[in-house]
Amino acid sequence: MASAGTQHYSIGLRQKNSFKQSGPSGTVPATPPEKPSEGRVWPQAHQQVKPIWKLEKKQVETLSAGLGPGLLGVPPQPAYFFCPSTLCSSGTTAVIAGHSSSCYLHSLPDLFNSTLLYRRSSYRQKPYQQLESFCLRSSPSEKSPFSLPQKSLPVSLTANKATSSMVFSMAQPMASSSTEPYLCLAAAGENPSGKSLASAISGKIPSPLSSSYKPMLNNNSFMWPNSTPVPLLQTTQGLKPVSPPKIQPVSWHHSGGTGDCAPQPVDHKVPKSIGTVPADASAHIALSTASSHDTSTTSVASSWYNRNNLAMRAEPLSCALDDSSDSQDPTKEIRFTEAVRKLTARGFEKMPRQGCQLEQSSFLNPSFQWNVLNRSRRWKPPAVNQQFPQEDAGSVRRVLPGASDTLGLDNTVFCTKRISIHLLASHASGLNHNPACESVIDSSAFGEGKAPGPPFPQTLGIANVATRLSSIQLGQSEKERPEEARELDSSDRDISSATDLQPDQAETEDTEEELVDGLEDCCSRDENEEEEGDSECSSLSAVSPSESVAMISRSCMEILTKPLSNHEKVVRPALIYSLFPNVPPTIYFGTRDERVEKLPWEQRKLLRWKMSTVTPNIVKQTIGRSHFKISKRNDDWLGCWGHHMKSPSFRSIREHQKLNHFPGSFQIGRKDRLWRNLSRMQSRFGKKEFSFFPQSFILPQDAKLLRKAWESSSRQKWIVKPPASARGIGIQVIHKWSQLPKRRPLLVQRYLHKPYLISGSKFDLRIYVYVTSYDPLRIYLFSDGLVRFASCKYSPSMKSLGNKFMHLTNYSVNKKNAEYQANADEMACQGHKWALKALWNYLSQKGVNSDAIWEKIKDVVVKTIISSEPYVTSLLKMYVRRPYSCHELFGFDIMLDENLKPWVLEVNISPSLHSSSPLDISIKGQMIRDLLNLAGFVLPNAEDIISSPSSCSSSTTSLPTSPGDKCRMAPEHVTAQKMKKAYYLTQKIPDQDFYASVLDVLTPDDVRILVEMEDEFSRRGQFERIFPSHISSRYLRFFEQPRYFNILTTQWEQKYHGNKLKGVDLLRSWCYKGFHMGVVSDSAPVWSLPTSLLTISKDDVILNAFSKSETSKLGKQSSCEVSLLLSEDGTTPKSKKTQAGLSPYPQKPSSSKDSEDTSKEPSLSTQTLPVIKCSGQTSRLSASSTFQSISDSLLAVSP
């Protein structure tokens, strides 16, 4: 249609099935060829009300833009049909015009006031398809002589807010032949008195219309077609441009759950002004305040089969076409589909399907709305020349004849099945959920020479087939911001429950828009932004904030499973409660088949998320299901998924906030830094432990070393990579020195020329690694991943080195290959992308031990993360207020050689979460949901958000405070914790038995860290923790500096990995007392130095090393075994009696050689504790200075 750029029609239907069949199905009663006079026809037309339009053609086909009438062999015979204004229940009319070189419109009396001009040229046959349209009518003030512009037709449409209409989707039989080159437009229905009406069609038209054909009414409602595309045939000559009259757009509501169309109730309020302005288009729609009562209702309905002939009510909206010089642009058109989608307002009324009625109240719940909105949905930005798998042959490619702009948008699909489309409000004042919004739609024509595709298969019922429309290119009218950021904001405001009115009102008053790019302003652009360009989130800025785009690729049609109704969804609590008492719960993130309950308003208002331009859609959908809102401020948000920042910028993150990056993680995220760190570890610990990374050289500094290695292996292939690139950009495979790029930083790496092949193709693995903490280090590995194949079979020949489809496995590269095959089944071993679990099944069938490969992958992942640990940990202590504030997802690219040895190729700090296939959605969707649950987002105290970060406050109305709150901890307990850490970090060569004693005494910090670890483990989902583990003690030697909490967690795992319940019960007993929060009474025992260290053999008096005041207390004790130790079961253990001078850990005699050796070690490992000997020999320390000296010695090395 002229206003939409795609094929649309309007079909009116009464609620009762009262239409009579006037003749055989598919036929039109013959009418006399007389031409009624204008004066007789128009008054007669106004007497008709609520008829049905009939398109009597079984097969209708469009004409390619590049083809003329002579090429098809059938001369065009256009037919014009004038339908009275009463054809629609609200007096709605439309104007549709085509193009023909032999036909001209000279005068159309009162066209925009009362009639529908319809013109159709049929050259070929095409099975009927889905029929969707709307009715157009202008206000009486716009009566003027009308003539068509050269290649565009202004469309007028106005609506009265006080009027509503009953609009239905229906299907009609269509008959056509090559000798019947006209389209019959009929109407049937009832007037208020119930009488059947006849059609009256007339007007002043050119001679080609003065034929014997006169369309008549046809009451036959036997068949219901899916779609009938009727494109706008553009006039090329003889037509004079005219200023477009004022119109009003239509409102189209989707239920979102089943694809059924459900317009709004009659009593729904209409915004006073909503405008849609096509930039540089043939007609402009601007804001209108039309309040004239003499207006008509505009309605739209999607064609779907309604067995019960149930009515749907469409709401009226107001809009106006604005006069513009751009209206003469012959290459632009108004896109109807996008206009009605953008202007849809709140309120969903679920229509029954298959005899099931869904209560409207379910849609008043924003949580349910979000589940419906996000279930099985992938948001796609506007795409140009987007290619889809070749096997999708069922698409309908509609071409607009005469189109001159060839943007090639015919392959993109607008999917409406199970998609909730609603208005994104950009103004949130008051309780009106339909604020005025103004946006621009940049319309584009289809490409020339595109032949219509095969007909749409009709194997499913019409109610189950998603509407397939042409793609829409959106323009920008304001600052570029992500579309789904605004959708998160509008989801809860568009649909609200009456019982939650006051909270929602408060939310509306608090304008929740996307934040100003505060974090992104300080992003390190030269750091690794791996695969951000491959993600759909990087292109979200192409959409203005008031536009909610429901564009997804055709593959979504294959993965849209039957949605669960509200009562079928699993209801989940909003919070995950801890395993331990006095520990705050974490926010729950659900799947698309779950409905997350709402928190009370006082807590729900704290759910704020900072949106970034690179926040993936799949993250937005997941947080939206948990009722997060977009924060406008920089201090009240809880989470952000954005760019990596420079390290000093992490100071701006407050204690209750989480960012998805660690400072310094680019140490493994950049290819050059990764090689430097791994080569350093290799030189320190040997190639046996660190030989999983191909030999690399960093140019220009390693040019001489590269030249030497190059000459030693003449037949060696080398792969050249930019140090901070992604998606295969700039990667080359070379074998000649002359092919090496000069004068720019590069990483030159030995090419793995003998990879493991499957069906002759090489592949790599995308492994998802999640780090929740660096101190203590906690690493998780997602159980599934992706297997990415090269799209050409591998050949070791030197002649094939330039073929990227053979040597590179990046999806961004291989998707451009015409031979690339997608895979829709996550368990199938087909196509060029598999699930990781499918690979393990494949290898198991080949007799390969996949478990052994998985264990090797775990090993290389842990070692790679440890190589970055010293940098990240030091930056965390320097710039991050609280370890809670950072977490990060890494994407490891691993390749298997012919011996199935895993090799780390690179590490991505921002792995692509773009979901372009059912396989991607299944794996990445589950992974993100489990990741966010594992992250443990905690609701802060409302006072903490407002108050200064350094203040320590509590609230009786908020959730329990963080376990890390040390405001109530006494100074002696803080001192004891530091001394214990120093005690276990000052040993040069500790053994396993010595480290095992760390669990004999638990401090408040110990309990807090172990509680966090066990709570986190219980939320792991499909993640597997690979560090710490019961075998991770072997990795402790790889740390540049020993970390006390790594020792603690590793020993805990070794002791309790086989009996988790026992360890959890022990921690629960201490949490019940509040010990993990530093709540220790005066009588509670605290940690002290082991008795074997400070035992005086003469009197067996155990000296406590806290302070002199503690010494006086010990002197008053009558017992010689009075060490204030806290054992695992909460009792005071018996001290271990050892000989004087013996230590529970191995000691080396002091020597100058030892001093030289230890001077090279980290500072924390250079000191040894003094040993006291009081058996008459000379003591290393005198008794009078023992206590203070030991205390100073320990605290001096305490981290």
Swiss-Prot record:
Record's compositionally biased regions (Basic and acidic residues): 477-495, 1151-1160
Start-end of Acidic residues biased regions: 506-517
Limits of the TTL domain: 604-947
Required co-factors: Mg(2+)
This protein's UniProt keywords: ATP-binding, Cell projection, Cilium, Cytoplasm, Cytoskeleton, Ligase, Magnesium, Metal-binding, Microtubule, Nucleotide-binding, Phosphoprotein
Residues at the site labelled Essential for specifying initiation versus elongation step of the polyglutamylase activity: R727
Subcellular location as annotated: Cytoplasm; Cell projection, Cilium; Cytoplasm, Cytoskeleton, Cilium basal body
Disulphide linkage map: none
Residues that bind a protein: R727
Pfam family, one: TTL
Annotated residues for binding of Mg(2+) 1: D893, E906
Family indicated by similarity: Belongs to the tubulin--tyrosine ligase family.
Task of the protein: Monoglutamylase which modifies both tubulin and non-tubulin proteins, adding a single glutamate on the gamma-carboxyl group of specific glutamate residues of target proteins. Involved in the side-chain initiation step of the polyglutamylation reaction but not in the elongation step. Preferentially modifies beta-tail tubulin over the alpha-tubulin. Monoglutamylates nucleosome assembly proteins NAP1L1 and NAP1L4. Monoglutamylates nucleotidyltransferase CGAS, leading to inhibition of CGAS catalytic activity, thereby preventing antiviral defense function.
UniProt free text on domains: The flexible c-MTBD (cationic microtubule binding domain) region mediates binding to microtubules. It is positively charged and becomes ordered when bound to microtubules: it interacts with a negatively charged patch on tubulin. The presence of positive charges in the c-MTBD region is essential for proper binding.
Protein known as: Tubulin monoglutamylase TTLL4
Gene: TTLL4
